[in-house]
């Protein structure tokens, strides 16, 4: 998939052009050190005036690891390392006490050295002396986002995440996922509302329902089979070229393929071939497509939201630029008229926005 420019530098430009919206990016912890990450995200939190959000991921693809001259770690080890990584970042963000900076010109003192501490961390995967060389940021570190689906990913989100992205193809699965994450968050000693759950959808709008359906059909037909296979192979970390295209996924014994078959069978109610799964994955990666006029899409969002109890949605545009602008201009006003979406911000930071009740 290319081009995929590094999103981190872009956040600085976006911060200069905006004042309130939260700004987030994905940053893998698999090929970095916590000190670098803690410094990077504290700096971004300052640049954005407290609007930074870090989507924490563990690399799950052998090809990505090979780019760094490394081999992919086993899943258990990746998550053990991830827990320690975030704990070290937290210690570094804590290394400056809230009132450490005094800026006493007369005494020539910028910060009280008694309130800036080494962390002296030495764990299984990392060592770091500290303190961080960036002062405490507006949010005391960025908001943490995550997209865990496996038991280990869900546990990680329940412990650390301010919000979690989820792809659930139907109401029953989404409700079970929602309840599981909220239960896990409480078990970690946090309030259930501390981790917001955002369900992924792909809205496709038209001036009429017929126009929207035509647009959806056109979009879905544009996806080449080879592209869908490549994306699916990357997401599964499995070479699909060795499998016949018309083989039923349900007949495969590989764990990765069984999970993907379950997702798409839940979405469609059908047993699908590799060809069909790859085509659908290339179209929406399993996201629910909500198709119709602005009013119809708002109806579908309300129905999903009310039945699941989720905290919000993650939008996946079918084209860019344009699709997000259409949603903001057409669906958001409709949701506001129904009292389902805020008309203003009540806070200034990303965490404020996530905690705001609409």
Predicted regions located by residue number:
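N-terminal glycine-rich cofactor-binding segment that shapes the pocket for flavin-like pterin cofactors
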Residues: 1-358
């Amino acid at each position: 998939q290319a081009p995929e420019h590094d999103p981190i530098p872009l956040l600085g430009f976006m911060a200069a052009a905006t004042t309130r919206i939260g700004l987030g990016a994905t940053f893998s912890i698999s090929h970095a050190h916590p000190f670098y990450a803690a410094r990077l995200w504290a700096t971004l939190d300052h640049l954005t005036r407290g609007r930074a959000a870090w989507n924490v991921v563990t690399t799950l693809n052998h090809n990505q690891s090979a780019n760094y001259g490394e081999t992919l770690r086993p899943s258990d080890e990746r998550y053990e390392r991830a827990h320690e990584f975030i704990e070290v970042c937290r210690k570094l963000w804590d290394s400056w006490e809230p009132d450490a900076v005094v800026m006493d010109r007369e005494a020539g003192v910028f910060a009280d050295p008694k309130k800036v501490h080494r962390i002296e961390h030495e764990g299984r995967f990392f060592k770091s002396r500290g303190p961080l060389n960036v002062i405490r940021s507006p949010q005391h570190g960025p908001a943490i986002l995550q997209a865990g689906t496996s038991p280990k990913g869900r546990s990680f989100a329940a412990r650390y995440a301010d919000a979690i992205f989820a792809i659930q193809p139907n109401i029953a699965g989404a409700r079970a996922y929602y309840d599981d994450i909220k239960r896990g968050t409480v078990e970690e000693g946090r309030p259930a509302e501390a981790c917001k759950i955002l369900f992924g959808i792909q809205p496709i709008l038209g001036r009429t329902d017929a126009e929207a359906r035509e647009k959806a059909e056109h979009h879905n037909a544009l996806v080449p089979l080879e592209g869908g296979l490549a994306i699916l192979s990357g997401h599964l970390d499995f070479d699909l070229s060795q499998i016949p295209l018309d083989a039923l996924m349900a007949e495969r014994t590989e764990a990765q393929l069984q999970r993907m078959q379950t997702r798409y069978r839940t979405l469609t109610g059908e047993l699908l071939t590799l060809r069909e799964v790859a085509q659908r994955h290339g179209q929406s990666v399993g996201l629910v497509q909500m198709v119709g006029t602005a009013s119809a899409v708002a109806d579908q969002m309300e129905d999903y939201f009310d039945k699941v109890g989720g905290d919000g949605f993650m939008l996946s545009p079918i084209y860019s630029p344009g699709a997000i602008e259409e949603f903001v201009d057409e669906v958001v006003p409709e949701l506001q008229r129904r009292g389902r979406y805020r008309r203003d911000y009540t806070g200034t930071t990303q965490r404020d926005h996530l905690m705001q009740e609409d």
